[in-house]
Every structure is written in structure tokens, then in C-alpha cells.
């Protein structure tokens, strides 16, 4: 779709040191953006005390973030479609840098929320362009591996970034954590500007993107986005309360709870590179296996929740289900985004933007539904997750050609 300046996407040796460096920069961008997004999770109490507001009010920062990202993603992607892809990425990272600086200096909650809105606006733009940039750096046969490589940054944000900012918030204050994220975001923005090709669109390619382009109905893309929204909703119904699930359903408490949370994140970190090659060769099979595993994990946790008995055996089964959940929830995301981009034809950025919007809607819907069901029982909450995952799995299984790689045109190399 783009013509990368100084980079050949048709080389027979795609994983050169230069391209590995470029993909690492993209992974760092994903890492710092996700770390900034979830920073309030580990700093809830510290922010609440410092700004003299309730913990509940601070918690709304995440919900409003998802709402702003969902509303602004598609319009912003269309508005910037004619930009070189590197510019869109760097602008997103600069906005993140400014946002974190505003947050670090915020004298009150309103200013903090305003700072968060700035990076929420460009959240969707970054996630709409980052995966397409990765796929354009390598041949089409390596697109899945390129996409999964940037999700390593997402996994590291959960395993390293979030715990690190949480620890800094507890020991030295949340403002210092925000300052550190500011510096890291600025460094990644500079690295992206220096390491990545400009990726300018040709005149014929501009006909397929932007505000003036015609966007015919794409049932395949719509179906991928709807199934993504259902699956993400199912995940976030329970993920918001994963600590409670580990404690009250699995029966793991104290220091072991923290270790199991870490295992959840590490499992996701390990799973991402493992699914890269299968995603390129058997995209539908890889997605079906991942969704089947997620459905099985939620079904097992549901059974344990209804059982209400804690034994060594149930703790072992529950631990396995949590680790499986962590591994596959992280692995399925790049699978679905790859499917969305393949469905987008000549406009993978626009397709990726619609995917990001569906993902953000799923986050909001899952958090809302999870809160309502949590007040009733954990068993009902987990049942909803298992049911929604089952619905998404069924839709993906019966859909024809949903995850197939389209036939490449000669010009695609």
C-alpha cells in the first residue's frame, strides 16, 4: 500500500538487523503507550490521595479513555490517511509525551483528565497505523510475524511497565512515574523518527484512503470487527476483577496471588512469538485454537465458581486456567488485527482503525457488564465471559474465508 523509503519489503531475508531494529522501535511504542494507558490502575490510591478525590473517580479515567478512543479513532484515521505513516506514528507519540507531562504537572483532577484525553484521542491512530507499518517492513508472507512482534511490547507493558509504574507510585509518588513515562515516550518518538522509513502514499494509493475516498461496504471487515467486539467484551467482563477471581474462585491468596498474576502476564509474553509462524501459515486454524482455549479457560473457571470448594486440585486447575487465559488473550489480539487488515484490501489502516474502535467498545461494554454481574455473583460473571467467548468462537468457525490471506497482486511483491 505504501512505498517505504529506503526499505525493500520484498527482500528474501526479511529479518535483517535493520528491520529487527525498526520492529523493536514499534514494539517500544506499543509498550510505552499501553504502560501510559494503564498507569492509573497501579496508582489509584496514590492519585486519589494526592488530588483529594475518591478512588472511584480516579478509576473512571480508564472508562473515559476507552470512550474517547472509540469515538475518535475512525474519524482521525480518515483525516490523517494521506499522511506518511511515520508522521502519523510520531505525532501520536508526541501527543502521548505532552499528555504525560500535563498529567505529571496536573494541579487537580480536571487537568489530569484533560491530559489523559489528549493521548486517548491519538490512541486509536497509533494502533491503526502501527501494525500496518510493521507488515510493510517485511514481505507479505511474514506479515503475521511482523504483527505479533509489536505485541511483545504490549505484553511487556503488562508484565514490566505496569508493575514498575505501580511500584514507583507507591515509593516516590505517581507524578514521578508519569515523568518517567514522559521521558520514555519522547525517546521512542525520536527513535521512530530516525529509524523508520517515511512511508509516503503514491497518488494511486490515495484514491483508496482518506475523507474523499469511496469506502464500499465490506462485510468481511464488519464481521471481523463484530466478532472482535464480542470476544473483547467477554474477556473484559472478567478481566477487570481478575484479582478477585484468583482469590475467591481459584483460592490463591497472599504472595501466591501476586505470583499468579505475574504468571498471567508472562504467559502472554511467551505466547506471542509462538503464534507468529502459525498465524502466517494457518490464520484461521490459529484463531480457532486460541478462541477454543479461551472458551475452555472461562468454562473451567465458571465450573470452579459454581463448585465453591477450594482444594489443592481446584487450585491447580484454576491456576492452569488463569495461565491459559493470559497466554491466549494476548495471542488472539494480533490474530484478529491481522484478519482485519487482510480484510481491508487497499486500506489496511482504515480497517485497523475500525478494529481498534471495535476493541475499545468491547472494553467499555465488558467493564460495564462485568460491574453489573459482579454485584450478583462471580459465577454469573464468568458464565457471561464463557458464553460470549463461545459465541465469538462459533462465529469464527462457521465464517467462510474470514481469515484467509487474499491473493496478492503482482505489485505487492
From Swiss-Prot:
It comes from the Bacteria. This is Chloramphenicol efflux pump MT0201. The keyword Magnesium does not apply. It comes from Mycobacterium tuberculosis (strain CDC 1551 / Oshkosh). It is a multi-pass membrane protein. It is found in: Cell membrane. Belongs to the major facilitator superfamily. GO terms for biological process: response to antibiotic. Keywords: Antibiotic resistance, Cell membrane, Membrane, Transmembrane, Transmembrane helix, Transport. One of its GO terms (molecular function) is transmembrane transporter activity. The keyword Transmembrane applies. GO terms for cellular component: plasma membrane. The chain crosses the membrane at residues 23-43, 55-75, 89-109, 110-130, 150-170, 176-196, 226-246, 256-276, 286-306, 312-332, 353-373, 378-398. Induction: Expression is negatively regulated by the transcriptional repressor MT1396. InterPro entries: MFS, MFS_dom, MFS_Efflux_Transporters, MFS_trans_sf. Coiled coil: none annotated. Active efflux pump that plays an important role in chloramphenicol resistance. Its main location: membrane.
Amino acid at each position: 500500500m505504501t512505498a517505504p523509503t529506503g526499505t525493500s519489503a520484498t527482500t528474501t531475508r526479511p529479518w535483517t538487523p535493520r528491520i529487527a531494529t525498526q520492529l523493536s522501535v514499534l514494539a517500544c511504542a506499543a509498550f510505552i503507550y499501553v504502560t501510559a494507558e494503564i498507569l492509573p490502575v497501579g496508582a489509584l490510591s496514590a492519585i486519589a490521595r494526592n488530588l483529594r478525590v475518591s478512588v472511584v473517580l480516579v478509576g473512571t479515567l480508564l472508562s473515559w479513555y476507552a470512550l474517547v478512543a472509540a469515538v475518535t479513532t475512525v474519524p482521525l484515521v480518515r483525516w490523517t490517511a494521506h499522511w506518511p505513516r511515520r508522521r502519523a506514528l510520531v505525532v501520536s507519540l508526541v501527543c502521548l509525551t505532552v499528555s504525560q507531562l500535563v498529567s505529571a504537572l496536573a494541579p487537580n483532577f480536571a487537568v489530569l483528565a484533560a491530559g489523559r484525553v489528549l493521548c486517548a484521542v491519538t490512541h486509536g491512530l497509533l494502533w491503526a497505523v502501527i501494525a500496518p507499518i510493521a507488515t510493510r517492513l517485511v514481505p507479505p508472507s511474514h506479515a503475521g510475524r511482523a504483527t505479533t512482534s509489536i505485541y511483545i511490547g504490549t505484553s511487556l507493558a503488562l508484565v514490566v511497565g505496569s508493575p514498575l509504574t505501580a511500584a514507583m507510585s507507591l515509593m516516590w509518588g505517581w507524578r514521578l512515574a508519569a515523568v518517567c513515562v514522559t521521558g520514555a515516550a519522547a525517546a521512542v518518538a525520536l527513535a521512530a523518527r530516525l529509524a523508520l522509513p517515511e512511508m509516503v502514499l503514491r497518488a494511486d494509493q490515495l484514491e483508496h484512503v482518506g475523507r474523499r475516498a469511496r469506502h464500499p461496504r465490506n462485510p468481511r471487515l464488519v464481521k471481523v470487527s463484530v466478532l472482535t467486539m464480542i470476544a473483547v467484551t467477554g474477556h473484559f467482563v472478567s478481566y477487570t476483577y481478575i484479582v478477585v477471581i484468583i482469590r475467591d474462585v481459584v483460592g490463591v491468596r497472599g504472595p501466591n496471588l501476586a505470583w499468579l498474576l505475574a504468571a498471567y502476564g508472562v504467559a502472554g509474553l511467551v505466547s506471542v512469538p509462538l503464534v507468529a509462524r502459525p498465524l502466517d501459515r494457518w490464520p484461521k486454524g490459529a484463531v480457532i485454537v486460541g478462541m477454543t482455549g479461551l472458551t475452555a479457560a472461562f468454562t473451567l473457571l465458571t465450573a470452579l465458581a459454581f463448585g465453591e470448594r477450594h482444594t489443592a486440585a481446584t487450585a491447580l486447575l484454576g491456576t492452569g486456567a488463569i495461565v491459559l487465559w493470559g497466554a491466549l488473550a494476548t495471542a488472539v489480539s494480533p490474530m484478529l488485527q491481522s484478519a482485519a487488515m487482510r480484510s481491508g484490501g487497499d486500506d489496511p489502516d482504515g480497517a485497523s482503525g475500525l478494529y481498534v474502535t471495535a476493541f475499545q467498545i468491547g472494553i467499555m461494554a465488558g467493564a460495564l457488564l462485568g460491574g453489573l454481574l459482579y454485584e450478583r455473583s462471580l459465577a454469573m460473571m464468568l458464565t457471561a465471559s464463557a458464553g460470549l467467548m463461545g459465541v465469538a468462537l462459533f462465529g469464527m468457525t462457521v465464517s467462510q474465508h474470514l481469515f484467509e490471506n487474499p491473493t496478492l497482486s503482482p505489485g505487492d511483491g
